[in-house]
Amino acid sequence: MSELLSLQETLYTSRNPTRRWLHRTRRARIEETLRLAAATAGSGRALEVGPGSGVYLPLLCQLFDDVVASDVEEAFLANARELAGTHPNLRPVADDITASGLPAQSFDVVLCSEVIEHIEDSEGALRAMHGLLRPGGLLVLSTPQRHSPLELAGRIAFLPGIVTFVRAVYREPILATGHINLLTAPEARRQLAGAGFDVLESGQSGVYLPLVAEFTGRIGLKLEQWIERRMIGGRLSGLLWVQYYLARA
């Protein structure tokens, strides 16, 4: 698990321009949406489901009076407890969102970023999040898109003999994603609606071009950014890496 923490911390400072851009873009989008959610739903209580390395917890603690970080992994909870030492309004708790013991209708905002792809019953998890929100509360959600080339490459990378080459190219932590439930945008919208949410805003980001990302540096990144601008909102937007939602309970 310490390897996973190391990986998550490396993503935002990666030596590889594309890897760094993909994750920083997602972080910026989530942070922007959290600020909007706090301004809309109020600055009372927030929950982050699956905080991982805790990249969003400091901002949540700035925006909200009381922040709960729930996870099932002790390493991530230990990391959150360290953060709580400097953020007294942060409370880490061991909780499984698929069988949550948190009080119903007790949060103004729930953040769930890059989590539901690890959960087989993602709609059940979304229903649980809906139940934790006060009426009119907001969910900030992100999850990878099923047909993203990056997700396909992530599976290919761990075929026998390939992962050694990939690690040699990146010279950084490379671990299997653990993504067992990738959704298309229509599927994600259906699950959100089925859980009782109304989508207020949505979007996508992130182009990954195999080999271009690994071997052409900043020149390749500029090409990926150019392609991304032309894909957003178009017929090929399902190939972008991450989908984002701001939804009301």
Outline where the language-model segments fall.
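Conserved SAM-binding loop of SAM-dependent methyltransferases across substrates and taxa
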Residues: 53-64
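Conserved alpha-helix/loop element of class I SAM-dependent methyltransferases that forms part
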Residues: 24-43
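Conserved SAM-binding motif I beta-strand of class I
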Residues: 66-71
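Conserved SAM-binding strand-loop segment of SAM-dependent methyltransferases
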Residues: 86-99
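A short acidic, Gly/Pro-enriched loop at the edge of an enzyme's catalytic core
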Residues: 98-109
